[in-house]
C-alpha cells in the first residue's frame, strides 16, 4: 500500500457549525519529506470545537479536524530518514525542523518552516493529500487526526516508545503538554510559591500538575463550574473557588486570600476578561501571569499599564513551550515511568462513528478528554 492511495473512514467537517460527517476518503501516498500514519486513537480538544464553530480565522472547509492523536507509521516519502514504517508516533501541530531561526533559538518552540501552508490547510508543497466525493479536503493544524490515515510533514512527527498505550498518550499531542509546560517552561514555577489556575478543564488540570511538580506550596483553582473542583483537588489543587460566589472581582478575592496576590497565574480558557483578572491577581513586584487559552479572533486584552509598571509580567505560551520533536518522546517516557498523569484526564472513550458525541460531552462540561478509537 506504500505507494498507493488508501481508502478509509474520516470525520469530515463540510462546513462550520455542522456536525462532523463520517465519510470514505482517499488518502494519497506521502510525497518527499512526508509520512503517512495509521491513526489508532485521537482525543477531541476545545481547539477542534473552536474551528468547527466558525470562530477560527484560519478555519477553512471542507476539512478533516483533529490534532491530539497517536498512531503507527504506514509509509514514508522520499528523503525521510528518521522515521520508518512501523514506528509508533504522535503527530505534532507545532513542528521542529531544527534549522529555522526559531528552532535555533532556545527561547521558543515556534518553528516557522511550514507555518504558511499549514495555516491554509495544505501540505508544505501547497497541496492536500485528502479527497472525498471528488472534492479536495483540507488538512488541519498539519495533523488531521480525525481520519484512519493521515499524511503529515516529517518534521511534524515525534517517534515514541512503542510500548506506550496510544489511547492514552495521544493526549500528549496537545492539552496535557500545553498545560504542564506552561507551568514548567513559561512561568518557571518555583518551590514554595502560590499559583492560581483559571479554568479547570484538561489544560488547567495539566497546569495544576505542573505547578505541583515544580513544588508550589499553594495552588488555587478558579472555575464557575463547581463540578470540576473535586478532580482539580485530585490533581493537586489546594483549594478551589467559584467567582460567582463573590460580590467583588475575583482578582480582589485572590489578593485578599494570598496576602497581596499570587506568584503565578494561568488563564486556561481563552476569555480576555479572565486574562485581565489573572494578571491583576498577581503579586506586585514579581507576579507572572501566563496566557494559555486561545481567545476568539479579533479579541484584545486590556489592563492599566500601572499593573506592569509595578512589576507584574504578562506572557503567553503555545504547546507549553516544548520543542516538539525532541520533547514529546521525553513526556511519553515521564508518563511510562509514572512521573506525570495521563490516564486520569481520560473521562470518556467512544468509537469513531460516535465522534460528534465527544463534542457534545465537552460543550456540556461533562468530560475532561474523550478519546476516540479508530
From Swiss-Prot:
Binds 2 Zn(2+) ions per subunit. It catalyses: a primary alcohol + NAD(+) = an aldehyde + NADH + H(+); a secondary alcohol + NAD(+) = a ketone + NADH + H(+); S-(hydroxymethyl)glutathione + NADP(+) = S-formylglutathione + NADPH + H(+); S-(hydroxymethyl)glutathione + NAD(+) = S-formylglutathione + NADH + H(+). GO terms for cellular component: cytosol; mitochondrion. Its EC number is 1.1.1.1, 1.1.1.-, 1.1.1.284. The modification N6-succinyllysine is found at residues 233, 315. Its main location: cytoplasm. The modification Phosphoserine is found at residues 247, 324. CDD domains: alcohol_DH_class_III (cd08300). Zn(2+) 1 binds at residues 45, 67, 174. It comes from the Eukaryota. Keywords: Acetylation, Cytoplasm, Lipid metabolism, Metal-binding, NAD, Oxidoreductase, Phosphoprotein, Zinc. Catalyzes the oxidation of long-chain primary alcohols and the oxidation of S-(hydroxymethyl) glutathione. Also oxidizes long chain omega-hydroxy fatty acids, such as 20-HETE, producing both the intermediate aldehyde, 20-oxoarachidonate and the end product, a dicarboxylic acid, (5Z,8Z,11Z,14Z)-eicosatetraenedioate. Class-III ADH is remarkably ineffective in oxidizing ethanol. Required for clearance of cellular formaldehyde, a cytotoxic and carcinogenic metabolite that induces DNA damage. Belongs to the zinc-containing alcohol dehydrogenase family. Class-III subfamily. This is Alcohol dehydrogenase class-3. It comes from Bos taurus. The gene is ADH5.
Amino acid at each position: 500500500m506504500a505507494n498507493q492511495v488508501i481508502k478509509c473512514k474520516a470525520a469530515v467537517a463540510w462546513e462550520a457549525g455542522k456536525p462532523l460527517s463520517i465519510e470514505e476518503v482517499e488518502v494519497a501516498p506521502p510525497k518527499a519529506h512526508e509520512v503517512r500514519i495509521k491513526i489508532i486513537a485521537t482525543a477531541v480538544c476545545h481547539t477542534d470545537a473552536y474551528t468547527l464553530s466558525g470562530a477560527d480565522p484560519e478555519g477553512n472547509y471542507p476539512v478533516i479536524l483533529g490534532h491530539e492523536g497517536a498512531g503507527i507509521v504506514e509509509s514514508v516519502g522520499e528523503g525521510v530518514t528518521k522515521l520508518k514504517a512501523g514506528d509508533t508516533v504522535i503527530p505534532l501541530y507545532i513542528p521542529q525542523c531544527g534549522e529555522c531561526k526559531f528552532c535555533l533559538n532556545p527561547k521558543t518552540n515556534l518553528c516557522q518552516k511550514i507555518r504558511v501552508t499549514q495555516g491554509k490547510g495544505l501540505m508544505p508543497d501547497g497541496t492536500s493529500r485528502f479527497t472525498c466525493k471528488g472534492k479536495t479536503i483540507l488538512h488541519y493544524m498539519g495533523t488531521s487526526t480525525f481520519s484512519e490515515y493521515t499524511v503529515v510533514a516529517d518534521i511534524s512527527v515525534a517517534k515514541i516508545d512503542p510500548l506506550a498505550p496510544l489511547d492514552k498518550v495521544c493526549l500528549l499531542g496537545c492539552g496535557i503538554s500545553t498545560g504542564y509546560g506552561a507551568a514548567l517552561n513559561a512561568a518557571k514555577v518555583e518551590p514554595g510559591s502560590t499559583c492560581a489556575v483559571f479554568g479547570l478543564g484538561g489544560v488547567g488540570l495539566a497546569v495544576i500538575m505542573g505547578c505541583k511538580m515544580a513544588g508550589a506550596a499553594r495552588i488555587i483553582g478558579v472555575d464557575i463550574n463547581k463540578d470540576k473542583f473535586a478532580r482539580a483537588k485530585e490533581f493537586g489543587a489546594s483549594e478551589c473557588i467559584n467567582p460567582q460566589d463573590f460580590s467583588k472581582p475575583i482578582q480582589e478575592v485572590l489578593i485578599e486570600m494570598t496576602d497581596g496576590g499570587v506568584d503565578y497565574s494561568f488563564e486556561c480558557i481563552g476569555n480576555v476578561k479572565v486574562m485581565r483578572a489573572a494578571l491583576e491577581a498577581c503579586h506586585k513586584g514579581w507576579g507572572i501571569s501566563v496566557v494559555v487559552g486561545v481567545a476568539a479572533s479579533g479579541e484584545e486584552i486590556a489592563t492599566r499599564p500601572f499593573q506592569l509598571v509595578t512589576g507584574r509580567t504578562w506572557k503567553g505560551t503555545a504547546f507549553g513551550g516544548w520543542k516538539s520533536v525532541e520533547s514529546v518522546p521525553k513526556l511519553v517516557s515521564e508518563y511510562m515511568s509514572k512521573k506525570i498523569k495521563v490516564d486520569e484526564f481520560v473521562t470518556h472513550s467512544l468509537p469513531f462513528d460516535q465522534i460528534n458525541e465527544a463534542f457534545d460531552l465537552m460543550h456540556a462540561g461533562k468530560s475532561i478528554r474523550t478519546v476516540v478509537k479508530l
